[in-house]
């Protein structure tokens, strides 16, 4: 009997989480669409978790800063990292040696860590240096769960469609910390409300 109640609890909980993420995806102002070579990835941004980070991402999207930026670090089974708008633009000034070390001209952001959300497949988090208050423009999309990141990196969204396309992003060499030779890119990034 208790096992049945526990199972029912988890079914209800899963439904609430799905409904919560779907509700964010239904908000065009907080829906980011990334065009990849094989199609579009839709991300529900989470201003409820990270209002400053989401605001900065949306500004960079609207400034077209993310267009043509490489997925410079991609580790199979872990994550795909992009967003280095200083050194990662494949059409303007791509620097294979420096990509991953740059950000935007906007200020770095104070950490907005969540204890309620966890790093799992499809979660989008902000990359940073050792300083927890150093996130700027780079972000990553998770291929699978990574509990060590929970409460250590700011969560900014969830992939709501197109995760199969994220899975196809060219992977890097694990021996080289996922550095990708001839990387895939974000062709275009937009906020759904701006169509």
Show the residue positions of the predicted features.
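Cyclophilin-like peptidyl-prolyl cis-trans isomerases
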Residues: 2-3, 9, 13, 20-195
């Amino acid at each position: 009997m208790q096992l049945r109640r526990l199972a029912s609890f988890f079914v209800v909980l899963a439904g609430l989480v799905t409904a919560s993420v779907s509700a964010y995806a239904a908000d065009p102002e907080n829906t980011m669409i990334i065009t990849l070579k094989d199609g579009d990835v839709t991300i529900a941004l989470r201003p409820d978790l990270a209002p400053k980070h989401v605001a900065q991402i949306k500004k960079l999207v609207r400034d077209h800063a993310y267009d043509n930026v490489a997925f410079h670090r991609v580790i199979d089974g872990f994550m795909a990292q992009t967003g280095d708008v200083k050194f990662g633009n494949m059409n303007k000034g791509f620097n294979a040696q420096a990509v991953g070390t740059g950000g935007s001209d906007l200020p770095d952001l104070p950490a907005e860590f969540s204890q309620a959300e966890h790093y799992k497949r499809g979660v989008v988090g902000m990359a940073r240096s050792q300083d927890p208050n150093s996130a700027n423009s780079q972000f990553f999309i998770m291929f699978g769960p990574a509990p060590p990141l929970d409460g250590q990196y700011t969560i900014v969204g969830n992939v709501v469609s197109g995760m199969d396309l994220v899975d196809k992003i060219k992977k890097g060499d694990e021996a080289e910390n996922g550095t990708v030779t001839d990387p895939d890119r974000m062709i275009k990034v937009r906020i759904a409300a701006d169509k």
